[in-house]
């Protein structure tokens, strides 16, 4: 969308897989910032901005269940990489997953269930051996968003620099 690439085959989502989720994930940061919320989050009758204490609660709620969500994403990444690095055929998908998930599971696996059978990203969704990019994007976007937090989340020069030096490059 913001790429300056002449050919679409080197822009948009046709970038290095380590980068593919950064543009979408960085955008999620603005939604819980007071300056952004004040642009639209207003009472429908009084037009009062969302109270500061509610904004604080919204930010704090991001930590609720975060460890479990993190482990879940790691599990997906482990399963993805396990399938795409395995050389021998797998006879028992449930057992295969049980061994993989032992590293990340807080709970015992439920019998007769298999994530792989409905986890479209790793086979048909374009993320084969690349599901890790979601977690990696969180690292990249957190680092990139720090510039916006330091300079103001709507700081024009920071935004121009991010677009020019990061988003516009595509796969160059």
What is the predicted role of each segment?
Residues 1-21, 26-34, 38-172:
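C-terminal, non-catalytic "cap/extension" segments appended to globular domains
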